[in-house]
């Protein structure tokens, strides 16, 4: 299970390239490195399950958190491709796309609509692993919501609140 990351400070990242790079390195580059090594080990074993935590922030990147969102978009794409590459190898990759999770990373922030708790995310992961799912949205309602969000014209999307 690959579960680490940083939200970072969007305002700071817009003027401090080192901070922006730190967010992207943590949320994308470091995860790609670990996933590549892990996948190779598990391919040789011909068995295993990999759980990767992306985010709905990467499904359609928003102005409010585009540094974090772009890193998660990259991770989401990498994990999707890796999951396809592992197909038939005995190794399963499950991509988890949580929405706003009330926890340490979001401490001090107002919860977004359809927020979840770490225990709700954990329960969804267990259900996904038990069912053989390749994608898990937490909460589930976010899947159809983001299907629609991807269809919105950029002029409307740009004005969307957090």
Task: Outline where the language-model segments fall.
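Rossmann-fold scaffold of SDR-type NAD(P)-dependent oxidoreductases
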Residues: 1-5, 52, 94
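Conserved mid-core segment of classical short-chain dehydrogenase/reductases
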Residues: 5-21, 64
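Active-site helix of classical SDR
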Residues: 35, 71
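Alpha-helical segment proximal to the catalytic Tyr-Lys
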Residues: 40, 84-88
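C-terminal helical subdomain
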Residues: 95-96, 110-147
């Amino acid at each position: 299970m690959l579960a680490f990351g940083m939200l970072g400070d969007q305002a700071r990242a817009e003027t401090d390239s080192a901070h922006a790079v730190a967010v992207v390195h943590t949320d994308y580059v470091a995860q790609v490195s670990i996933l590549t090594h892990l996948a190779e080990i598990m391919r040789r074993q011909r068995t295993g399950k990999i759980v990767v935590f992306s985010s709905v922030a990467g499904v359609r990147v928003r102005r409010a958190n585009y540094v974090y969102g772009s890193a998660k978009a990259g991770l989401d794409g990498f994990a999707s491709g890796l999951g396809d590459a592992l197909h038939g190898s005995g190794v399963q990759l499950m991509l988890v796309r949580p929405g706003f999770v009330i926890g340490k990373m979001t401490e001090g922030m107002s919860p977004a609509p359809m927020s979840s708790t770490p225990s709700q995310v954990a329960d969804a992961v267990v259900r996904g692993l038990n069912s053989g799912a390749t994608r898990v949205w937490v909460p589930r309602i976010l899947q159809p919501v983001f299907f629609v969000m991807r269809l919105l014209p950029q002029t409307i999307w740009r004005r969307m609140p957090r």
